[in-house]
């Protein structure tokens, strides 16, 4: 079966592998994952990775997506791409993805990307083809700001939802993962490419 693509980005100090494993559990073989690696933060792999800036992440993400489409065209379903970002990956996604909403239509922004929106940017996201935005927060600071951003999206005609995992902090822990799993039917609503588990 052909499957939709899910772009996955990590936070500073995180790794592409860890977030690929996380999202593989969440989507349970219902999407093709493309996990974008950052630069090494130091000589020790335990130092993790980071993205230098959003134009670099944008360039590398869409080059990787083009390569994936060229190599695995027979396995990729037509239609919009999903984007899941944590922390730095979420913030940079919010900065770069409005211009790519004709291709990347549904976003999951976890503990980042919550303060980069306005009604005008939300409207531009919708006008270019954006369909849904899920904010996930573990801190009050994130949740307060994401609540405003979700309201901006609703004003612009884009379904948006906030999942606040009170007490989880700046993490993508098991509680956050469980909340994302629970919200997945909302995120993928009306997308026939996502078969129920």
Specify the residue positions occupied by each region the protein language model found:
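Serine-hydrolase catalytic machinery in alpha/beta-hydrolase-like enzymes
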Residues: 3-76
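Alpha/beta-hydrolase-fold catalytic nucleophile elbow
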Residues: 37, 84, 110-111, 136
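Alpha/beta-hydrolase fold nucleophile elbow
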Residues: 74-86
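Gly/Ala-rich beta-loop-alpha elbow adjacent to hydrolase catalytic centers
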Residues: 85-89, 93
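Conserved hydrolase catalytic core segment
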Residues: 95-105
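A conserved short beta-strand
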Residues: 103-114
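The feature captures the conserved acid-bearing segment of alpha/beta-hydrolase catalytic domains
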Residues: 112-185
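Alpha/beta-hydrolase-fold serine-hydrolase catalytic core, especially in secreted/extracellular enzymes
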Residues: 156-158, 188-197
